[in-house]
Amino acid sequence: MPSVLLADQLEMSLYSSGLLTGVVVDSGCGLTRVQPFHLGRPLRPGATTLEFAGQDLSVYLFKSLFKEDYNRHNLFQLDTVASTQMRKCYVPQNLGDELDFYQNLPDGADERNSYHLPDGTAVELTPMQRLAPEMFFSPQVFGLQGPSLAQAAMDSIEACEASLRPLLASHVAPCGGNTLYPGFTMRLYQLLASHFFPTKASVFAGSNRHFSVWLGASVVAHLSTYKSEWLTKEEYDERFRL
């Protein structure tokens, strides 16, 4: 390896969206973080880390699907939870309206609520199982502490200088696997747009945003402006030679 650059993951995610200034909203398996940037530099007062992420959603589904028999190391259960998350879960635009819709729906009327386990057994999913990603917008409903992801993004922007807030609100970049749930980016946009009106809010959501760190790093690797920040093998040997 001729040279290496240790970089901020959230900064790389920002670059993958083609931005230098904006707010990165990153939610993966173990962490949910919000970080504003201006001209590629992090605005520390707006940095936020939330206490829930994708693993909490998985645990919720494990417990609700398998109850006292749940075992996160059971391959059958792992496959069931992963498939449910990918194929059935989504973010509603309004939780109350969605629950009212399900309440008035006859049993078996919506085939999307049905799921076949790996052994072929048919299971009828409950509304809250399908709406589990609501966790990121209403954590208290699921017994989790702290502000919602959208509120954290609002607070992050509000913590920055007033002159930067309109620019930050109009350049929000969600990334990480949890942001891929259907309805996620639309819900985030609607909440931001409502909060910051009449400032225009915009959400930059690329289709490969679960790989945003890698994509941004690939961009940086080809920029000559960053060459001075790389640590070469010769410099490493000179500085850290035992």
Kindly give the residue locations of the regions a language model identified.
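C-terminal region/appendage detector
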Residues: M1-L242
